[in-house]
Amino acid sequence: MAAKGPREKIKLVSTAETGHFYTTTKNKRNMPEKMEIKKYDPVVRKHVVYKEAKIK
C-alpha cells in the first residue's frame, strides 16, 4: 500500500473549455490555495491557463 503523506492528486483543467486536462500532485500543507498554471493545450494548439479541479 502507498504511504500516506500530504500530497494529493489534482486535475488541472483548461480554461479554453476544450475538455483537456493534466493530472498532477500537490502538497496541500505548503500550497493550500488553488493552483493556476500556464500549460500547452494541444486542442487549441496554444498555451492557456489551467486551473485546479478535484479528481472524481
UniProtKB/Swiss-Prot annotation:
Query: What keyword terms does UniProt attach to this protein?
Result: Ribonucleoprotein, Ribosomal protein
Q: Which domain of life is it from?
A: Bacteria
Q: What InterPro entries is this protein classified in?
A: Ribosomal_bL33, Ribosomal_bL33_CS, Ribosomal_bL33_sf, Ribosomal_zn-bd
PROSITE patterns attached to this UniProt entry: RIBOSOMAL_L33
The record's Gene Ontology cellular component field reads:
cytosolic large ribosomal subunit
Q: Which family does it belong to?
A: Belongs to the bacterial ribosomal protein bL33 family.
**What is the protein name given in its UniProt record?**
Large ribosomal subunit protein bL33
Q: Native species of this protein?
A: Pasteurella multocida (strain Pm70)
